[in-house]
Amino acid sequence: MEIFAANWRLAAVAALFFVGIVSRRTGVASEKQGRALLAFVFNIGLPILIFGALAGVQLKREHALLPVAAICVSLAGWGAAAFVARRFGLPRIGEGAMVMCAMSLNNSMIYPFAALSLGAAAFSQLVAFDMGHALLVWTVTTVVACKYGGHADDIPVLLRRTLLAPPLWVLFISLALNLGGAPIPRKFLHAVLLVGQFAILAVPLAMGLLVSARGLRRPEVISAVALRSGFGVLVGLTLVWLFGLSGSGAAIAIIGSAAPIGFTAVVLSSREGLDLDLAASAAAISVFLGSLWIPLAMFFVPR
């Protein structure tokens, strides 16, 4: 029973995705509502989630290599996805969506299993890994999304779209409060985190409204899924060797590197006018597969 209680998010993701599909097919809602939901998540849901997750987490020096590993995984995914997309002959918006899929890690799917299975030390290592990814997503990845969205030649527009992104400002504010030792009540942060987790559930609902049967069968969609987890785990193994990681730190780096496609790939693809069908379809498949392999992977993390 504990495993089901700890993973209500996975059940909610599956249910909301199904509701989105049914709503679109019955004409209750359409792609327009799906894009509106993603705009809500980007401007409101994600900032709330980031503040609740990062403002109070303990930052330790011994975890310094794990954020670096997360950043390296995302950057390597960028290069690999750009190469594969060009082999497919995808247009700019298709290449951009594939890059978003490769750069965005859905570590939030790992948290429920980690909270149930791991000790405090290993769980804090997962948080450290995720912080590196969060920092990259709302800086470099956001700029990359703007670039593929057609703003690369207009530097003022590129900077404005990046610097005015609410998640970026909340990320900096959260880290500043954390490093400054601001006395924020734990109960308040926990409540904010719960609100953010509920708000982010609008993404699978939007994915259901946006995904298509044709999209799920596209070869570039399958390639995006393989890049995120298959190529990601190879990069993770390489980084473990290069950084000399061992024990739970090595396991967290490998599992985190293979994490499913993050919902931020769908959100940023929507914001910048990229191939949303590709991003939503790939994320849907990746999340489903992650729900199968992540629980098994937890057994290999040293306690």
Features from the language model and the residues they span:
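Alpha-helical transmembrane segments of multi-pass small-molecule/ion transporters
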Residues: M1-R303
